[in-house]
Amino acid sequence: MPKTISVRVTTMDAELEFAIQPNTTGKQLFDQVVKTIGLREVWFFGLQYQDTKAFSTWLKLNKKVTAQDVRKESPLLFKFRAKFYPEDVSEELIQDITQRLFFLQVKEGILNDDIYCPPETAVLLASYAVQSKYGDFNKEVHKSGYLAGDKLLPQRVLEQHKLNKDQWEERIQVWHEEHRGMLREDAVLEYLKIAQDLEMYGVNYFSIKNKKGSELWLGVDALGLNIYEQNDRLTPKIGFPWSEIRNISFNDKKFVIKPIDKKAPDFVFYAPRLRINKRILALCMGNHELYMRRRKPDTIEVQQMKAQAREEKHQKQMERALLENEKKKRELAEKEKEKIEREKEELMEKLKQIEEQTKKAQQELEEQTRRALELEQERKRAQSEAEKLAKERQEAEEAKEALLQASRDQKKTQEQLASEMAELTARVSQLEMARKKKESEAEECHQKAQMVQEDLEKTRAELKTAMSTPHVAEPAENEHDEQDENGAEASAELRADAMAKDRSEEERTTEAEKNERVQKHLKALTSELANARDESKKTTNDMIHAENMRLGRDKYKTLRQIRQGNTKQRIDEFESM
């Protein structure tokens, strides 16, 4: 049994360990990786490794892993990376996993400044990256400092502005809040839609020379070949779409491109090393094949993948809508509960007030009852005295009668009796007056008692009403491989058909131009960052970008411009650079 070989493959967000046989091919290892991570859009990707000369190289799929120039270490180290880029991410990247791998790789390129990104776009992209990681902003969860552990902006951008970490976080947070309701997967796609408009996105640069020996850059991307001046990798000067190229070949350091236009001369340039020409050839073949494939109807497999992706997206949207609905219901229930609690507290307070009023009324009633009793006793005393006076008056009357009788009987003592009579008469008069006074007082006491009785009845009625108020019940709660040959030359025919004439990429506009929301955000960010910018720290790329903006250029306008004229004119222009 042959001894197995340990292999470690690092994707953009995972580390995979495999044990392979000595005869395992690059394709077998590649297939094992894509199966493990659930990736079906395999045509964009490849396995990268550092060879024995420390050059970054793509693993050849048709050769054994052990037969290639991989460093003999344990485990063997590979990176799973995107080798080819789509023309339009929203049209071509189907699976969420594909979009995520591109997102992470592009983000890394932007943060490392391998892809130039202006400051305002960098902040906007950072907000989409935050949305994809954290979801909707929630002030209860995302407290101050929640982005402290995240690298979100290129070091160049941080150094060019007089803003501290908290101030950067505040700005990113504002835009994070703007993306409320956006699915994490949609935030990833929005990030890529903006990033693909960056001039250096998806471009592989190679240092070349023309026949004159001028130092230039060759850019190989999804749309064709572009030529750049040595000091400007943002603005290509000449462009050749894949649809104009018939054959590509190299012999040692010389690279030859034959155009479809037979009247046009060969497009020749020189690379510093043979291995670079091998890589250019592999990239040209892969990008050309994908360029042609895009201009044909989708294969059954791609159609199925798109249908499945649509279904999955629809399912996620349904789940999201359901979650949002549940969230709203929960929030409404919480508000209703708070309202009920508030009403309960108000009713309890009202009940307390009623109890206090009842207690006060009870005390007043008791006081009035006591006062009524006192007045009744006083009335009884006055009545008793009146009765006593009446009795005394009667007795005086009787005495008077007796005296009169005595007067008749005793004429002798008439004068004396007359005198006594006068006295008794005066006494009777006094007693009569006293009786009338007492009767008047008794009547007054009677009236007061009657008034107190009426107040008492009224208070009893109020108390009865208060006591009959119902008790408030508490409410219820609710590949293309690089050539294997050791030879110093290789050639590839780039087949073309009727679809090759489709150059729809020249009609494209940037996301900022067609999306008013993105345009508005970028304008606001440009204005916001201008005050904090340190102009002395501008880089060459910053100045080139600013000049392009001033002239109204963007990636696609430049593309249209550099493809003007026939192939011969552009090759002549390249030779004269």
Curated annotation (Swiss-Prot):
<comment type="function">
    <text>Ezrin-radixin-moesin (ERM) family protein that connects the actin cytoskeleton to the plasma membrane and thereby regulates the structure and function of specific domains of the cell cortex. Tethers actin filaments by oscillating between a resting and an activated state providing transient interactions between moesin and the actin cytoskeleton. Once phosphorylated on its C-terminal threonine, moesin is activated leading to interaction with F-actin and cytoskeletal rearrangement.</text>
</comment>
<feature type="modified residue" description="N6-acetyllysine">
    <location>
        <position position="165"/>
    </location>
</feature>
<dbReference type="InterPro" id="IPR011993">
    <property type="entry name" value="PH-like_dom_sf"/>
</dbReference>
<protein>
    <recommendedName>
        <fullName>Moesin</fullName>
    </recommendedName>
</protein>
<feature type="short sequence motif" description="[IL]-x-C-x-x-[DE] motif">
    <location>
        <begin position="115"/>
        <end position="120"/>
    </location>
</feature>
<feature type="modified residue" description="S-nitrosocysteine">
    <location>
        <position position="117"/>
    </location>
</feature>
<dbReference type="InterPro" id="IPR000299">
    <property type="entry name" value="FERM_domain"/>
</dbReference>
<dbReference type="Pfam" id="PF20492">
    <property type="entry name" value="ERM_helical"/>
</dbReference>
<dbReference type="GO" id="GO:0001931">
    <property type="term" value="C:uropod"/>
</dbReference>
<dbReference type="Pfam" id="PF00373">
    <property type="entry name" value="FERM_M"/>
</dbReference>
<feature type="modified residue" description="N6-succinyllysine">
    <location>
        <position position="83"/>
    </location>
</feature>
<dbReference type="InterPro" id="IPR011174">
    <property type="entry name" value="ERM"/>
</dbReference>
<dbReference type="GO" id="GO:0031527">
    <property type="term" value="C:filopodium membrane"/>
</dbReference>
<dbReference type="InterPro" id="IPR029071">
    <property type="entry name" value="Ubiquitin-like_domsf"/>
</dbReference>
<dbReference type="InterPro" id="IPR011259">
    <property type="entry name" value="ERM_C_dom"/>
</dbReference>
<dbReference type="GO" id="GO:0045198">
    <property type="term" value="P:establishment of epithelial cell apical/basal polarity"/>
</dbReference>
<dbReference type="GO" id="GO:0070489">
    <property type="term" value="P:T cell aggregation"/>
</dbReference>
<feature type="region of interest" description="Disordered">
    <location>
        <begin position="322"/>
        <end position="342"/>
    </location>
</feature>
<dbReference type="GO" id="GO:0071394">
    <property type="term" value="P:cellular response to testosterone stimulus"/>
</dbReference>
<dbReference type="GO" id="GO:0005902">
    <property type="term" value="C:microvillus"/>
</dbReference>
<keyword id="KW-0007">Acetylation</keyword>
<dbReference type="GO" id="GO:0061028">
    <property type="term" value="P:establishment of endothelial barrier"/>
</dbReference>
<feature type="compositionally biased region" description="Basic and acidic residues">
    <location>
        <begin position="358"/>
        <end position="401"/>
    </location>
</feature>
<dbReference type="GO" id="GO:0097305">
    <property type="term" value="P:response to alcohol"/>
</dbReference>
<dbReference type="InterPro" id="IPR019748">
    <property type="entry name" value="FERM_central"/>
</dbReference>
<feature type="compositionally biased region" description="Basic and acidic residues">
    <location>
        <begin position="531"/>
        <end position="549"/>
    </location>
</feature>
<feature type="region of interest" description="Disordered">
    <location>
        <begin position="468"/>
        <end position="549"/>
    </location>
</feature>
<dbReference type="GO" id="GO:0003779">
    <property type="term" value="F:actin binding"/>
</dbReference>
<dbReference type="InterPro" id="IPR019747">
    <property type="entry name" value="FERM_CS"/>
</dbReference>
<keyword id="KW-0702">S-nitrosylation</keyword>
<feature type="domain" description="FERM">
    <location>
        <begin position="2"/>
        <end position="295"/>
    </location>
</feature>
<dbReference type="InterPro" id="IPR046810">
    <property type="entry name" value="ERM_helical"/>
</dbReference>
<dbReference type="GO" id="GO:0019899">
    <property type="term" value="F:enzyme binding"/>
</dbReference>
<dbReference type="InterPro" id="IPR018980">
    <property type="entry name" value="FERM_PH-like_C"/>
</dbReference>
<dbReference type="GO" id="GO:0072678">
    <property type="term" value="P:T cell migration"/>
</dbReference>
<dbReference type="Pfam" id="PF09379">
    <property type="entry name" value="FERM_N"/>
</dbReference>
<dbReference type="GO" id="GO:1902966">
    <property type="term" value="P:positive regulation of protein localization to early endosome"/>
</dbReference>
<dbReference type="GO" id="GO:0042098">
    <property type="term" value="P:T cell proliferation"/>
</dbReference>
<feature type="modified residue" description="Phosphoserine">
    <location>
        <position position="527"/>
    </location>
</feature>
<dbReference type="InterPro" id="IPR008954">
    <property type="entry name" value="Moesin_tail_sf"/>
</dbReference>
<feature type="modified residue" description="N6-acetyllysine">
    <location>
        <position position="79"/>
    </location>
</feature>
<feature type="modified residue" description="N6-acetyllysine">
    <location>
        <position position="139"/>
    </location>
</feature>
